[in-house]
Structure formats: C-alpha cells, structure tokens
C-alpha cells in the first residue's frame, strides 16, 4: 500500500559498489560523480543511496561504499560535504563501526575516512558534526586508531653491538636445540633454555617493543594499514606478513612484501614466532590433502564435460559425491596460493639481490686484479727465438733479425791501438783457390758499421741453447773469448777474424737444421797476389749443422771428437791458443 519512493542513484551506486568487483572501478565512480553534479538534488539522493549500501552485510560492499563517498567528497564540492556531515550519514557510520559483526578492516577504514573528512571540513564550522562523530568513535574504539609513526633515529654503535650479541645468542640457542636429543648431560640445559621460549610462543603476539633486534625476528604481521609518506617506505595492509631483512633506524626495520622492499615502523606490526614442528607438519598435511584431491577434480570435470545437457546432476550420485569432496579443498587451495605467491616474490627478490651481489663482486675482483701499465724507457726487447735460455745479455737480439738494423748482432769493439784496417778484404777481389765457404748461419753483413757505432761488451755472451757445446779442450781457449787473429808475419799477409755469430732466422729450430740459409758466403774474396788463407775454418754454431755440413757438431765428451790441429805446410806454425787471441 505504502511503497518507498525509488531513488535515481540506487542503480548507479549499486553498480559502483558491486560485491563481485575485484577492485574499485573508477569508471563507475566517476559516473556517479557526474550525475550528482548534473542534478539539483543529486547530493541528497546520492548520500541516501550510500546509507543503504552501508547496511549491506558484505565487507567488500562496505569498503567500496566508503571509497565512493570519499571520491564524492573530493569531486563534488560543498553540497556533498553538507550531506556527508549530516546526522543521518554520521550515525550510519557510527552504527556500522560499533557492530560486532563488522569486519575489523571495515572499522579501520571508517576511522581513517572520518579523520580525512574532518580535516577536509575543518574550514567550515557548519560541518562540525563530522568532527564530533570522529572524536566519539576514536574514544569508543582506541584500538582502531593507528599509532603515530616514530621518528627515524640513526642506530648507534651500542645498538649494533647489542644486535650482534642477540644474533649470536639466537644462533647458539638454535644449535643447542638441534643437539638436545643427543647426549644426556645436555638434556637439562636444553630443556631449561627451551622452556622460556615455549612460554614466549604461548603468549599472545603484540606490537614489537622498541629496541628489539631485527637479527632475531624473521617475519612480522601488520596490525594497521600503512600508507607511505616518504620515498623508501613500504606500503602494507592489516594482516599482511612482512619478511624482515635488517634494521635501518632505531624503530624502523627494512622488509619485503609482494616483491616490494622498504622500511616500516615497528609500532604498526607484531612479531610472529617461527613455526613450530607441529605447525609445519599441519601445513604439510594440508598440502597433501589438496594435492590428493587433484584426481577427483579432474574426474569431476571430465564427467561434467562429457555428459549431455539434459543430465540431472542431483540424481547422479557419483557427481554429487565428487563435488562435495572437492568443495572442501577450496579454502585450503586459496591459502596455499597466497602462501606460495608470497614465497615466489621472496625468491624472485632474493635472486635479484644475488645477481646484483655477484656483479658487484666481479667488478671489484676485476678492479683489484687490474694493474696499471708500467712506463717503458728506451727500446723494448724483442722475443727470443730458438730454445729458451737463462736470459740474453745486453747486445744480443731478442727477436727476428731486422734487415734495416745491422748493428743488432754482437760484435766487440776493436782496440784503439790497432791500425785502422779493414777486417775483411774488399768484395771486388776474387777468392783464393784454397778458400772454402762453410754453410750455416754465417752471413755477410750488408755494411760494416763504423768503429764508433760498436757498443763495448765486457762479458761473455750466453748461448741461447739449452746445452751449449764447447769446441776446445782445457788446453785451448774458447773461441768466443777472443775474436781477433794474432798479428801476422812481416810479409804483410792479411789476417782474418771469424765473423760474429748471428742469431738464427725466425723459422730456425733444432729439429729442422736444413732450413738455414746457405746461399751466401760470410767470407769475402781474397787478393790474387796473396797466398791462400788457412784452410782450417772456424767451427759452426752448435745445432745448426746438418748432414751436409762439412764440419760435424759434437760435444767434447763424444767419441769422434777431435781437437784442433794446425796445418803442416805453407802456413807458419802458430799455437792454436794464440790463433784465437
């Protein structure tokens, strides 16, 4: 007979606060805001529709209604402010907050929104009803109001030392608990230590006291919603479990939640004890039950998909039993999804930290191993060919022979008291009939350098071979000690000096002696008018003679080794030792 008048905003408000929404739909919310501004009585009708939605028993509908009211207060001006600060709307808020069946998160959201509206309406004294309602709600429910954030004070050295001591005590306690079941003498000590811990776990959890070390706490649960006001703070809602990482400030810890890392105040969270053995067994049993129902869920899905549409599900006993058995795992499945989703975020974040730490370590390692280049003075040495020796002395080349640098071969400086005479006859003279040119590494210099270009060497050059061979016994001096012939007779016979030993070519090796260039004779031709030079030639370099060499290379200890014998005619008889002087 008497029917309430239909409100034009009921459908729009119900659409924006639907219980099936997963989050606030701002498209629907803005549609309501536009409609309120377009109609004369839009503010009054919209608030009336909001009061109806606050009476809904679904917590999501109540939360969406509070968000819609806050959006109207921010976008629709003084008209909606007056309706929100009315007695009817504030009484609806107080009634919902005082209901014991109302969700705790809804109560906290009511207190938060009333505080925001009180600050928003503070400039107009006509809207004082909202401030009165807020003070009344805070007095009646002191546990709803979140505490004020503590100041960010730096951690002192004493706090760091205390944290380290607590960490060492926790490690010692865990080691003692693990070894409690082994020797009998340790049973009393372990039981006496674990008794206070069991009492602490049985006690109700509360806010983390100031001064508690993060080294002994692995996770905390949020008691209130926290909105960051500065960069680097972690946002969370009531009931979220935060993994503790480290202490940053005096009453601020650093933690991770859903892949995000930041700091949070200690008075907004409560300490969660580590799970006991019974809790771990209970979780494992719950997971086993969920995974045990996988086959039943697949079987139920197969039966429902293969049956015809005319099948009466209520009359099919098998489908009914499968549905009832699998329906019980739904809450457990949702809980496991949330648990492993958080673990996935934690492992992902741990992997990112490990990658960053590995890159930092590698960069520091490369920087420590890098050495600054040493400045080189003078001409750098060339690499040595042939067999490696103990080190080449000054004057010996350490690389392949350069054609443009004939002075790199070792030659001693001639004495200053000798006459300025050429060691080699002119190249225009033809060789004598008794002169032979031994093959091997002896090559003629392209141009005889001036005496001033010689560098004096006052030590015996070392061989570049592993096993150098001497060609003279103890009776004779070594040919490399003195490289000049003794003064000749008065007849003016030219005297010859053995050419300096040259470094083998780059492709020379001990296993391939035939590769030595044998195309050029190191001794120039002698004058025709002069008597023939000595037929005995200096011995070749050890290791360079091949099978075709006229003089075999042998060590002094070999059986076929023969000492030097002077010729018996045509040439004055000189002592071999004096011959090499």
From Swiss-Prot:
Stretches with biased composition (Pro residues): 529-542
Region feature (Disordered): 176-213, 368-581
The SH3 domain, residue ranges: 215-274
Residue stretches of biased makeup (Polar residues): 464-476, 508-521
Signal peptide positions on this chain: none
UniProt keyword GTP-binding, yes or no: no
Superkingdom of the organism of origin: Eukaryota
Membrane topology recorded in Swiss-Prot or TrEMBL: Peripheral membrane protein
Bias (Low complexity) ranges: 181-197, 370-403, 442-456, 545-559
GO molecular function: phosphatidylinositol binding; ubiquitin binding
InterPro entries: ENTH_VHS (IPR008942), GAT_dom (IPR004152), SH3-like_dom_sf (IPR036028), SH3_domain (IPR001452), STAM (IPR050670), VHS_dom (IPR002014)
Domain UIM per the UniProt entry, residue ranges: 162-181
This protein's record includes keyword Protein transport: yes
Main location: membrane
GO BP: protein transport to vacuole involved in ubiquitin-dependent protein catabolic process via the multivesicular body sorting pathway
Pfam families: GAT, SH3_1, VHS
The entry's keywords: Endosome, Membrane, Protein transport, SH3 domain, Transport
Subunit composition and interactions: Component of the ESCRT-0 complex composed of HSE1 and VPS27.
Known function: Component of the ESCRT-0 complex which is the sorting receptor for ubiquitinated cargo proteins at the multivesicular body (MVB).
Family recorded in the similarity comment: Belongs to the STAM family.
Protein name: Class E vacuolar protein-sorting machinery protein hse1
């Amino acid at each position: 007979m008497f029917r309430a008048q239909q409100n034009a905003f009921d459908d729009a408000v119900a659409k924006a606060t639907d219980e099936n929404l997963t989050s606030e739909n701002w498209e629907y919310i803005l549609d309501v805001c536009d409609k309120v501004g377009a109609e004369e009585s839009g503010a009054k009708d919209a608030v009336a529709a909001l009061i109806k939605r606050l009476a809904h028993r679904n917590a999501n509908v109540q939360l969406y209604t509070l968000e819609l009211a806050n959006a109207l207060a921010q976008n629709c001006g003084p008209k909606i402010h007056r309706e929100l600060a009315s007695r009817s709307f504030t009484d609806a808020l107080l009634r919902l907050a005082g209901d014991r069946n109302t969700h705790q998160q809804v109560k906290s959201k009511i207190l938060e929104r009333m505080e925001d509206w009180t600050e928003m309406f503070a400039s107009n004294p006509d809207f004082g009803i909202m401030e009165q309602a807020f003070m009344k709600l805070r007095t009646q429910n002191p546990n709803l109001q979140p505490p004020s954030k503590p100041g960010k004070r730096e951690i002192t050295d004493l706090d760091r030392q205390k944290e380290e001591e607590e960490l060492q005590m926790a490690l010692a306690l865990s080691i003692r608990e693990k070894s409690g079941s082994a020797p009998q003498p340790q049973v009393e000590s372990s039981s006496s230590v674990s008794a206070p811990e069991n009492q602490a776990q049985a006690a109700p959890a509360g806010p983390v006291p100031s001064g508690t070390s993060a080294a002994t706490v692995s996770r905390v649960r949020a008691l209130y919603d926290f909105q960051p006001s500065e960069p680097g703070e972690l946002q969370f809602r009531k009931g979220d479990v935060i993994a503790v990482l480290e202490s940053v400030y005096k009453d601020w810890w650093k933690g991770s939640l859903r892949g995000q890392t930041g700091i949070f105040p200690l008075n907004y969270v409560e300490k969660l004890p580590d799970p006991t053995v019974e809790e771990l067994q209970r979780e494992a049993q719950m997971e086993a039950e969920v995974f045990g129902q996988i086959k039943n869920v697949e079987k139920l899905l197969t039966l429902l998909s293969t049956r015809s549409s005319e099948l009466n599900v209520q009359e099919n006993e098998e489908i009914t039993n499968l549905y009832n058995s699998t329906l019980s795992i739904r809450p457990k499945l949702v809980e496991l999804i949330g648990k492993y989703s958080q673990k996935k975020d934690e492992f992902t974040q741990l992997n990112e930290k490990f990658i960053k730490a590995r890159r930092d370590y590698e960069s520091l390692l490369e920087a420590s191993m890098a050495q600054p280049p040493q400045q080189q003075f003078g001409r750098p040495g060339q690499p040595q060919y042939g067999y490696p020796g103990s080190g080449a002395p000054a004057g010996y080349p350490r690389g392949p022979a350069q054609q443009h640098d004939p002075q790199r071969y070792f030659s001693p400086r001639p004495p200053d008291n000798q006459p300025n005479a050429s060691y080699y006859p002119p190249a225009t003279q033809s060789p004598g009939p008794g002169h032979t040119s031994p093959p091997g590494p002896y090559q003629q210099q392209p141009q005889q350098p001036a005496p001033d270009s010689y560098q004096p060497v006052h030590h015996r050059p070392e061989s570049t071979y592993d096993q150098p061979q001497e060609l003279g016994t103890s009776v004779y001096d070594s040919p490399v000690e003195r490289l000049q012939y003794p003064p000749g007779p008065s007849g003016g016979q030219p005297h010859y000096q053995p050419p300096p030993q040259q470094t083998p070519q780059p492709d020379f090796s001990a296993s391939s002696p035939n590769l030595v260039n044998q195309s050029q004779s190191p001794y120039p031709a002698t004058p025709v008018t002069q008597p023939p030079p000595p037929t005995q030639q200096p011995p070749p370099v050890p290791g360079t003679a091949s099978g075709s060499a006229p003089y075999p290379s042998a060590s002094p200890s070999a059986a076929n080794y023969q000492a030097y014998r002077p010729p018996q005619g045509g040439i004055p008889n000189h002592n071999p030792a004096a011959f090499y002087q």
